[in-house]
Each structure stands twice: as structure tokens, then as C-alpha cells.
């Protein structure tokens, strides 16, 4: 009798559902997965090593390019680690701005996750709906930093600039936008950035309802997600899960509540948790987080309206002087020149700072030898821990379910390969 061998199949890295450059070697018995072996490193750019040859400020833009869907949250952990070592604290207004943009980033990330997960499984419409709202939030990024993605907006000691009083307007009509649509878009952008964000928070709950109408009770969506990739709470903790992956298994661990940073202890929000630990519960957790992030943004907008103030510390050894002062005062010019050529020196020591990133706990472990460059920078990427469980989560499932599991893990290779 002939020996029966399992079939080996390469999934990715060119596969559209591979979320970038995942190469997955699947061992199959018929169509049932026996083993899944992820091969990583195809997007390795040596970020940790590059940072050792740049000043603390020059290394900041590298952070945006790690998880390139949650840009400002990456920056946040990095600047928090530097501030911890310098012993400085950002002004209260800057802390509120950071929290607000962290939550805007969380919505950006979850919309991308939701849309691409649905697209992978075969529901195309949700992706188009999600990108409609992402466009508005990209405009918020652009308003404060000039860039739609890689903002470099958070700085040690605060943020780059205060929130602008005006928003850019859209130009003439095109075949993609009618006069009526253009007027509606420009009306929302006729005031300040805070007005625009407030208008968005008023509209957004109805948008989330639309996504839920398309997916939550959809029979095909539930058949594809319910009971797939189940991880129990103890195993989730043992595997190092954080974020929606851990909360989907029923563990209410959220750094914003358990180890509050910035002004999260002043915010009123809930931590959604799942029950069954399957792909469907993780989807429900992310949808609930969209609503909670919207709540937090509203609270930040209300506070920021009523409390003007500085957004950067006044120590010009760390933070650059204002542009007008720099061009009229010799001492300020020297500060500016020294800061952007030599940078600032961080006292010898080490610090770990972690934020509740949209994908989980994103941590920066920073070691300084007293120089103007990091001696060592270690990045704790949440997706790295989640990807290692892919083999365990997909065993016994069909090939098509591997796509569902990759989608639910919300993997981005910028942070995994670093």
C-alpha cells in the first residue's frame, strides 16, 4: 500500500490576504491544516540598530514606520521612554492632545483591520465603507503634522505644535465628487480642527452601526468566524497575547486602565471583553473599541476647547524654541542649532515605556550610556507574540480558515520584522 504523505503549500508572501510579506508554509492533510510555519524577516529594516546611530530626535520618525497603520501610538511609547529617563513631563494640554490622537489612531487601525479582514473573507463593501471614515481621520493627521501617515508629531516634552484653527478645504468638483458632496465636506472643514473632530464624533456612531449591519448578524460572516481560532484565557496569557487578542479571550487587561499613562485615569470609558475567545469575539471587541475610542475623543475635545495652554515644555535643551524667537534672539538660535545637530544627552540608565497600542502592548525598552544617541533600543511589538500562535490557532481548520485567523490577528509586518 502506498504511503500517504501530507501536502506542503506556500501561502504568501504574494498572497493578497498575507497582510504584507507573510510567508506561511502549510502542511495539509487534504484541505485540513496539520501545521502552519510562519517565515518572517522579509520586511526587516534593522530599526533597532539604525536608532543607535541617530540622535534621540532623529530616531523618532523610524517609529512611525514600524506599525504603519498605528503611527502616533508607536511614537507615544518612544517619547514616553525618553521623558521617563529625562525626568520631564509633557504639559497637560499636550497630554490631552496625545490621548486624543492615540484614540484617533486606534479608530484608524481598527477600521483598516475590520475592512481588510472582511475583504479577506469575501465581504468587499465593508472595506470601502471603512476607508470613507479613515479619509477624515487622515485629514486630522495632515492638519497637525502636514503628513497623512508618518506624522512625527509627538516629541520629547510635548507635541510638535498646537491644534490649528483652520482646516484645508477640498478644491473643485471631479467625476468622483458632486457639488453637493463637496459642499458638505467643506462645511465640516470650515472651522477649527477641534470643530472638525467634534463633527466626526457626532457622525461616527452611525457609521459603526452601518458596519455592524453589514457584518455582525450576517450569516456568512458568522459561519466564517464563530468557533474559528479559539484561544482560552490561560493559553492567551501564556502565549503573551495583549490588546484585542487577549480581551477577546475574556481577560480584561488594558494598560489604559491597569497602568494608566498620560490622562487616561481622567477618562470615562469601558474595556470590552469577549467570552468565547474565537475570531467572532475578537471582531466584536474591536467594534466595541471603536465606540469607546469615540467616547474618549469627545471628552478630550471638550477639555481642549476650555483649557488653552502650552503644548511643549520650556526647557530649550530638550524642546526647540519658537520659530519667531529663534529668528530674533541669538541665544535661541544657538539652542535650535545645537538641538538639531547634536541633540540632547540623556542620563545613563534604562527605561521601559508601554502604551495600549491598537494591536496590544507596544513597548520601548531604552538604554542610555549618557550620550546623545540610544545605546540600545528594544521594541516590544504586539504582533510578534500573536503571530507565534498562528500554528496553534489554525491546526485542524481548513485552508480558508487560515485567512480568517491571519485577519483576526491584525498583523502588520513593519512592527514584527522591525
Curated annotation (Swiss-Prot):
It is an enzyme of class 7 (translocase). Its EC number is 7.1.1.-. It catalyses: a quinone + NADH + 5 H(+)(in) = a quinol + NAD(+) + 4 H(+)(out). Pfam families: Complex1_49kDa (PF00346). It is a peripheral membrane protein. It is found in: Cell inner membrane. GO terms for cellular component: plasma membrane. The keyword S-adenosyl-L-methionine does not apply. GO terms for molecular function: NAD binding; NADH:ubiquinone reductase (non-electrogenic) activity; quinone binding. InterPro entries: NADH_Q_OxRdtase_suD, NADH_UbQ_OxRdtase_49kDa_CS, NDH1_su_D/H, NiFe-Hase_large. Keywords: Cell inner membrane, Cell membrane, Membrane, NAD, Quinone, Translocase, Transport, Ubiquinone. The keyword NAD applies. NDH-1 is composed of 14 different subunits. Subunits NuoB, C, D, E, F, and G constitute the peripheral sector of the complex. NDH-1 shuttles electrons from NADH, via FMN and iron-sulfur (Fe-S) centers, to quinones in the respiratory chain. The immediate electron acceptor for the enzyme in this species is believed to be ubiquinone. Couples the redox reaction to proton translocation (for every two electrons transferred, four hydrogen ions are translocated across the cytoplasmic membrane), and thus conserves the redox energy in a proton gradient. HAMAP family: NDH1_NuoD (MF_01358). Belongs to the complex I 49 kDa subunit family. This is NADH-quinone oxidoreductase subunit D. It comes from Bordetella avium (strain 197N).
Amino acid at each position: 500500500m502506498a504511503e500517504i504523505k501530507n501536502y506542503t503549500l506556500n501561502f504568501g508572501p504574494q498572497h493578497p490576504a498575507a497582510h504584507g510579506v507573510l510567508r506561511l508554509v502549510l502542511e495539509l492533510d487534504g484541505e485540513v491544516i496539520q501545521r502552519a510555519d510562519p517565515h518572517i524577516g522579509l520586511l526587516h529594516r534593522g530599526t533597532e540598530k539604525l536608532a543607535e546611530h541617530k540622535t534621540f530626535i532623529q530616531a523618532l520618525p523610524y517609529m512611525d514606520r514600524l506599525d504603519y497603520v498605528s503611527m502616533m501610538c508607536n511614537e507615544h511609547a518612544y517619547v514616553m521612554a525618553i521623558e521617563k529617563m529625562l525626568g520631564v513631563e509633557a504639559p497637560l494640554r499636550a497630554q490631552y492632545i496625545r490621548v486624543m490622537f492615540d484614540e484617533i489612531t486606534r479608530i484608524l487601525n481598527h477600521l483598516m483591520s475590520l475592512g481588510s479582514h472582511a475583504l479577506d473573507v469575501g465581504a468587499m463593501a465593508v472595506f470601502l465603507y471603512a476607508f470613507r471614515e479613515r479619509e477624515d481621520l487622515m485629514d486630522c493627521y495632515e492638519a497637525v503634522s502636514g503628513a497623512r501617515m508618518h506624522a512625527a508629531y509627538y516629541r520629547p516634552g510635548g507635541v510638535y505644535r498646537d491644534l490649528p484653527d483652520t482646516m484645508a478645504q477640498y478644491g473643485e468638483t471631479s467625476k468622483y465628487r458632486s457639488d453637493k458632496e463637496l459642499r458638505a465636506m467643506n462645511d465640516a472643514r470650515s472651522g477649527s480642527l477641534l470643530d472638525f473632530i467634534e463633527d466626526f464624533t457626532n457622525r461616527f456612531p452611525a457609521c459603526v452601526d452601518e458596519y455592524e449591519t453589514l457584518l455582525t448578524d450576517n450569516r456568512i460572516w458568522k459561519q466564517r468566524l464563530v468557533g474559528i481560532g479559539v484561544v482560552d484565557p490561560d493559553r492567551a496569557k501564556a502565549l503573551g497575547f495583549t490588546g484585542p487578542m487577549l480581551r477577546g479571550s475574556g481577560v480584561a487587561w488594558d494598560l489604559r486602565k491597569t497602568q494608566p499613562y498620560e490622562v487616561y485615569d481622567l477618562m470615562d470609558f469601558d474595556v470590552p471583553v469577549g467570552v468565547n475567545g474565537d475570531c467572532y469575539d475578537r471582531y466584536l471587541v474591536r467594534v466595541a473599541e471603536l465606540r469607546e475610542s469615540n467616547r474618549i475623543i469627545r471628552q478630550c475635545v471638550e477639555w481642549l476647547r476650555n483649557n488653552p495652554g502650552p503644548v511643549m515644555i520650556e526647557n530649550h535643551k530638550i524642546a526647540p524654541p519658537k520659530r519667531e524667537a529663534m529668528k530674533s534672539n541669538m541665544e535661541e538660535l544657538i539652542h535650535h542649532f545645537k538641538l538639531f545637530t547634536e541633540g540632547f544627552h540623556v542620563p545613563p540608565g534604562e527605561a521601559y515605556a508601554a502604551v495600549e497600542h491598537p494591536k496590544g502592548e507596544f513597548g520601548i525598552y531604552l538604554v542610555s550610556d549618557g550620550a546623545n544617541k540610544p545605546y540600545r533600543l528594544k521594541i516590544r511589538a504586539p504582533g510578534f507574540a500573536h503571530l507565534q500562535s498562528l500554528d496553534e490557532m489554525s491546526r485542524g481548520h481548513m485552508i480558508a480558515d487560515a485567512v480568517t485567523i491571519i485577519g483576526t490577528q491584525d498583523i502588520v509586518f513593519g512592527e514584527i520584522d522591525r
